[in-house]
Regions:
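N-terminal export signals
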Residues: 2-24
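C-terminal segment of N-terminal export signals and the immediately downstream linker at the start
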Residues: 18-49, 153
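A short glycine-rich, His/Asp/Glu-containing loop-to-beta-strand
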Residues: 44-80
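Short, conserved beta-strand element in jelly-roll/cupin
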Residues: 71, 85-99
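Histidine-centered catalytic micro-motifs
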Residues: 79-85, 123
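Short acidic-glycine-tyrosine-enriched beta hairpin
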Residues: 104-118
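Ligand-binding loop in jelly-roll beta-barrel domains
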Residues: 118-145
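Acidic/histidine-enriched, glycine/proline-rich intrinsically disordered or flexible terminal extensions
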Residues: 153-184
Length: 184
């Protein structure tokens, strides 16, 4: 047997064993239910006129998926942005929204779904006068759960230079703002 191969085998076996362990690791050993209007961890997150309830945490899926249910009273939404590493998905429960993905804008109502691939600029805005509600999903979750928690805190403790603070927060979490919020 080749001596180099013999010496490399234990190292390779260790790396493969660690990788297999990480792929099979699951933080949720059983299913769970999160009731309507409730957050998975009883946290209260309010961001830009919307309440965000975590339904599936990145901790539940080893970072594979994150789902928020957002109820929005006010019109509008976030600035045009993209994620380096996450796809973002939108499922409308009630109300009307406009969702832009790349150069295309879609008017969405209850039951409609939109997919925004990673690295493609996108944004949404609630356009209806009545309350709006949608599921916002990220795959993989990446740093998005932490982003939402920090955004909520930023709204409670507004810095003097909000534009700079937002740019830094987006950048730290793998996103880039590339335009203003949608006009509707």
């Amino acid at each position: 047997m080749d001596r180099r191969l013999f010496l490399q085998f234990p190292l390779l076996a260790s790396v493969l064993a660690l990788q297999a362990k990480n792929q099979s690791k699951t933080n949720s050993s059983k299913g769970f239910v999160v009731r309507s209007g409730k957050d998975r961890y009883q946290e209260e997150l309010y961001i830009m006129g919307g309440e965000f309830d975590c339904k599936v945490s990145s901790k539940d899926t080893d970072g594979a998926l994150l789902i928020y249910d957002t109820v929005r009273e006010t019109k509008g939404g976030p600035a045009l942005h993209f994620h380096e590493s996450q796809d973002e998905l939108f499922y409308i429960i009630k109300g009307e929204f406009i969702v832009r993905v790349g150069d295309d804008a879609f008017n969405l109502k209850a039951g409609d779904f939109a997919f925004a691939p990673r690295k493609i600029p996108h944004a949404f805005a609630k356009t209806s006068d009545s309350e709006g509600q949608m599921l916002v999903m990220f795959q993989p979750a990446g740093l998005m759960e932490d982003f939402f928690k920090q955004m909520s805190q930023l709204g409670k403790n507004i810095p003097k230079d909000m534009e700079h603070a937002l740019k830094d927060l987006f950048s730290t979490h793998g996103m880039q703002v590339v335009g203003p919020p949608l006009k509707y």
